[in-house]
Regions:
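Short, well-ordered alpha-helix to beta-strand connector turns
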Residues: 31, 69-70, 119
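Loop/turn-to-beta-strand initiation segments
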Residues: 2, 99-104
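N-terminal beta1-alpha1 ligand-phosphate binding loop
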Residues: 1-27
């Protein structure tokens, strides 16, 4: 199994980067795993048209990196909510398609609709707001938890 995490921008907070490293190490027990940073568009003003342009550009960059046969999971505020066991079952089912999973997070402005159309799975972490870097950390933790659940290992500690 291959698992890739894609995120626009590069995290500067050491404590979060340390968390990424820890979960990449833990996940390497179960799969070949990687974290890839994508270009993040800088917006000079928060106008709707500027944000839309930036999201389209970020989406184009992301879609170039995702192969047609990869299963794309997106973290999206509009996505479906799952508990940990449901999410583990979903990952297990999707990984049986070809074993190549990609988890994509949007920038702080979200995701373009072209990404939503390409996604195989759209899920929400919570109704709470997180930075996209923290959302990636939480996603990695949940993927790790899912792997443990799917193998019948203790997962709640």
């Amino acid at each position: 199994m291959n698992i890739r995490f894609l995120i626009p921008g590069k995290c500067r907070e050491k404590y979060i980067k340390d968390g990424y490293d820890e979960y990449l190490k833990r996940l390497s027990r179960f799969a070949k795993v990687s974290l890839e940073y994508l270009p993040e568009e800088i917006i000079s003003n928060n106008s709707e048209s500027e944000i839309s342009k930036a999201l389209k550009k970020e989406a184009a960059n992301a879609l170039k990196r995702i192969k047609d046969d990869e299963v794309l999971f997106i973290v999206d505020i509009h996505g479906k909510s799952y508990d940990s066991k449901e999410f583990a079952s979903l990952i297990d089912d999707q990984s049986k398609k070809n074993g190549n999973l990609v988890f994509l997070l949007g920038s702080s402005y979200g995701l373009d609709d072209s990404i939503r159309k390409r996604a195989n799975v759209s899920f929400s972490l919570s109704k709470l707001t997180f930075t996209h870097y923290m959302a990636l950390f939480l996603t990695m933790e949940q993927v790790y938890r899912s792997m443990k659940i799917n193998r019948g290992e203790n997962y709640d500690k």
